[in-house]
Amino acid sequence: MVLSPADKTNVKTAWGKVGGHAGDYGAEALERMFLSFPTTKTYFPHFDLSHGSAQVKGHGKKVADALSNAVAHVDDMPNALSALSDLHAHKLRVDPVNFKLLSHCLLVTLAAHHPADFTPAVHASLDKFLASVSTVLTSKYR
């Protein structure tokens, strides 16, 4: 999916407003995913999945850091996310549908924390961006 210049601006602006809360938002999105889509818990059998768990917070920070990297390299996401794509495809073997589920939960989390900034245009741009990230992460599954 091709991001327009306006999409890239919207994504960078929206992610910039996340600021120092990125790890918290990542953890919140994971918690939403685990509650809304319980089958996703199967990839984390060794985690304490309770609210506020240090393991969920730690993984939420990893998710947020990966997204920050994708935002910073929006014009070259395949190279920026190559190692992460390898990890998910070959070692973790995460079902690709889970990226869509997490993307949805991230959108809900961002909308809940930044309702005034979450315009239809920003929503569409973030959705396209997260779909692009998902495509890159699943590109090595073939």
UniProtKB/Swiss-Prot annotation:
Residues with PTM Phosphothreonine: 9, 109, 135, 138
Gene3D superfamilies named in the record: Globins
InterPro entries in alphabetical order: Globin, Globin-like_sf, Globin/Proto, Hemoglobin_a-typ, Hemoglobin_oxygen_transport, Hemoglobin_pi
Modified residues (Phosphoserine): 4, 36, 50, 103, 125, 132, 139
GO cellular component assignments: blood microparticle; haptoglobin-hemoglobin complex; hemoglobin complex
Modified residues (N6-acetyllysine): 17
Binding site for heme b: 88
A single GO BP: hydrogen peroxide catabolic process
Tissue specificity: Red blood cells.
Keywords: Acetylation, Heme, Iron, Metal-binding, Oxygen transport, Phosphoprotein, Transport
UniProt GO molecular function: haptoglobin binding; heme binding; iron ion binding; organic acid binding; oxygen binding; oxygen carrier activity; peroxidase activity
Globin domain location: 2-142
Residue(s) carrying N6-succinyllysine: 8, 12, 17, 41
Transmembrane portions of the chain: none
Sites where the protein binds O2: 59
PTM-bearing positions, type Phosphotyrosine: 25
Function recorded in the entry: Involved in oxygen transport from the lung to the various peripheral tissues.
Complex formation: Heterotetramer of two alpha chains and two beta chains.
Protein family per UniProt: Belongs to the globin family.
Protein name (database record): Hemoglobin subunit alpha
Species name: Sapajus apella
Gene label: HBA
